[in-house]
């Protein structure tokens, strides 16, 4: 069963909130609440998250509900957004602030771009509090590099199991 989250209009509003106030992941309250009511009806035994950024979920509502349900969560990570105060990737900027606490982000103009404020410190603190509030979560990075980074982050408190992205070896092969 596929459950849609919000509408295209909601995505646009969340994007505007991100651009103006650097609040990526803090919009879409109504869409997230509606989605969570659908999930609650299903009463799943486990929740499997992937990318939760993309202008469609309110991470506070999501993680507060996950905490109250107290069911296992598996979170597959495809990038670094979950443990930074702003960016999805930081290597190009040579930034390691996320290892202690993000602030004065050198990449506010990069996805998820903010034209206004730099809330990377507040975002970092909020993400850390929310994302480490669950009792039963396993982090699944899609590469060994990402697993090493996760273990240096606040998400390092959780079990971490790398499962690489699958590739078709009949099409792709070492050169």
Give names to the regions the model predicted:
Residues 1-175:
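Catalytic cores of nucleotide-sugar-dependent glycosyltransferases that transfer UDP/GDP/TDP-activated
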């Amino acid at each position: 069963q596929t459950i849609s989250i919000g509408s295209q209009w909601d995505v646009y509003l969340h994007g505007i909130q991100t651009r103006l106030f650097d609040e990526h992941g803090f919009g879409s309250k109504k869409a997230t609440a509606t989605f969570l009511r659908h999930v609650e009806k299903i009463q799943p035994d486990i929740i499997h998250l992937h990318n939760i950024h993309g202008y469609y979920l309110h991470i506070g509502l999501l993680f507060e509900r996950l905490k109250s349900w107290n069911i296992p969560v598996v979170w597959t990570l495809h990038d670094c957004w979950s443990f930074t105060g702003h960016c999805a990737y930081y290597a190009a900027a040579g930034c390691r602030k996320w290892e202690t606490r993000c602030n004065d982000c050198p990449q506010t103009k990069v996805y998820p771009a903010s034209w206004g404020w730099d809330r990377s410190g507040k975002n970092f603190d909020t993400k850390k509090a929310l994302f480490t509030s669950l009792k039963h979560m396993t982090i699944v990075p899609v590469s060994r590099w990402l697993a090493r980074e996760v273990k240096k982050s606040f998400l390092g408190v959780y079990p971490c199991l790398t499962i690489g992205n699958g590739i078709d070896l009949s099409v792709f092969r070492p050169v």
